[in-house]
């Protein structure tokens, strides 16, 4: 029993610590990529090419004073960042990085992830209410409405994948897409693929869906009153969720750790590449897409975001799920 606890704790640390480092350097990549897109240089002072900038940014945040607003609910004010941070990292417990390399290979892995990503909104809403600030409250209410609107579309997209794969286990979904690129689900489930990723951008409150913390309207939204390490927890949760959406999109629609050259003549050339490399390469594409979209599109109005979710994404995903269910039932399509 003790050995199991120690092994599990070690595995958790092997996931969480590298993930936090990736999050730190994802912020560096964001500033660099957007800088180049806007014909700027980006961070280049701290260390060679600015590579130490994330480390010093983290030190700056964690050394700052934690200020508690007057008349705020002190207990809820302190617990809200933890409620946002913990689910964002707990969701990684069921992510397989390669065959057998997973902390907990659940049969209901997708359901667990959906529950964890939905739970993060409680931290945001509590932060908005406990801060005793109208701007925080407005941001929290916007976040709640946005999550409800786009969680449904994401849920329907996941249902389509589950129907196609015949499994809610993440490993089962990846194995169902083995056999080369033509077996990946982004082809037959293309509308669900597009909707899932866009809904993931909205779910993480990233541009152009960042009305939750729209600077020109509500300053910084739900975390306007947070400083130091408490603000850093919200920051770490947001970027961890972005990476989670990227890796889930790779797993559900691009075959996960499967090589695109399976069952082709090129497999003999690329067969030596480990599955984890393919998974990280696909994930990196979507991580870049988050940054590209932010640098390209202006912020949508709140009514436009609601209209897109309720009038376009939800009906589209619902109809496509019905089509997928009928095709699976009739045995149509080479992907199943």
UniProtKB/Swiss-Prot annotation:
Record's keyword annotation contains Cell inner membrane: yes
PROSITE patterns per UniProt: COMPLEX1_ND1_1, COMPLEX1_ND1_2
Top-rank taxon, per record: Bacteria
Catalytic activity line of the entry: a quinone + NADH + 5 H(+)(in) = a quinol + NAD(+) + 4 H(+)(out)
EC number(s) from the headed UniProt entry: 7.1.1.-
Family according to the record: Belongs to the complex I subunit 1 family.
Name under which the protein is recorded: NADH-quinone oxidoreductase subunit H
Species whose genome carries this gene: Francisella tularensis subsp. holarctica (strain LVS)
Encoding gene (name): nuoH
